[in-house]
């Protein structure tokens, strides 16, 4: 895998499980983790404020979580969005569940930055265009610095 900072990352097996076991790290580090979940900047896409919440348990569907796990996962999503809003990272977000075949369930917390509206007026219908734009135009030192700063804010707020 190539991470958002254009670095090659090696791991074995399921990438979410490998990340939870700390087999690889992101340049910005993990924003938050507990016994059941990880929260981090998206690994591959250089979009400031684009976070991923993933269970540490290897499951591939939302229904595979217990009610307690679902409640906790949504609390992490809600808290992350509140932190990002309070720090003026973004005002609006899309929250997407990714249940790919033979892949680990995770939730995308996708900020709706102004540039996205210019690239794709209907962001959820044209998500591929937004992601392609980020990969092509946002791999810059300025973006990496923003990602680091935002991750530090989220980490600090979760650890208070």
Residue ranges and their predicted role:
Residues 1-160:
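HIT superfamily nucleotide-processing domains
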């Amino acid at each position: 895998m190539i991470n958002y900072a254009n670095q090659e990352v090696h791991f074995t097996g399921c990438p979410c499980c490998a990340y939870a076991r700390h087999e690889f790290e992101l340049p910005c580090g993990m924003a938050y983790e507990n016994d059941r979940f990880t929260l981090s900047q998206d690994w591959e896409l250089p979009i400031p404020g684009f976070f991923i919440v993933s269970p540490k348990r290897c499951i591939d569907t939302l229904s595979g979580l217990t009610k307690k796990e679902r409640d906790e996962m949504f609390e992490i999503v809600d808290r992350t969005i509140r932190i990002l809003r309070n720090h003026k990272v973004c005002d609006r977000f899309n929250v997407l569940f990714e249940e790919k075949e033979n892949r680990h369930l995770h939730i995308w917390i996708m900020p709706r930055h102004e540039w996205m509206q210019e690239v794709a007026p209907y962001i959820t219908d044209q998500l591929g265009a937004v992601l392609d734009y980020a990969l092509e135009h946002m791999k810059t030192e300025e973006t990496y610095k923003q990602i680091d700063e935002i991750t530090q804010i989220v980490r600090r707020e979760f650890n208070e």
